[in-house]
């Protein structure tokens, strides 16, 4: 086995300058996005997720109301509806992720 040759010293790291990374250009984001702006943008990108969340919350609220009133059959139906709405929301999230991944590849 051959002994490694002498290592040529590289330029020392200068902490005052960021390292150069190929394909990366640092930019300064001057306008940070607030909660309201981000919520509106995300809702426009994938409107089915908030719809699913509202459906889930509505089914849960009405199911608890029926449970409180003693309507156990209707309460059970609303809990099953809530599970379906949660499933719809998860599928909407996954489809939104898949669409954004395909958009970034193109």
Swiss-Prot record:
One of its GO terms (cellular component) is mitochondrial inner membrane. Residues 20-106 form the HIG1 domain. It is found in: Mitochondrion membrane; Mitochondrion inner membrane. The keyword Oxidoreductase does not apply. Disulfide bonds: none annotated. The chain crosses the membrane at residues 47-67, 83-103. Its main location: mitochondrion. It is a multi-pass membrane protein. Gene3D superfamilies: 6.10.140.1320. InterPro entries: Hypoxia_induced_domain, RCF1. One of its GO terms (biological process) is negative regulation of apoptotic process. It comes from the Eukaryota. Associates with cytochrome c oxidase (COX, complex IV); proposed complex component. Proposed subunit of cytochrome c oxidase (COX, complex IV), which is the terminal component of the mitochondrial respiratory chain that catalyzes the reduction of oxygen to water. May be involved in cytochrome c oxidase activity. May play a role in the assembly of respiratory supercomplexes. This is HIG1 domain family member 2A. It comes from Mus musculus (Mouse). The gene is Higd2a.
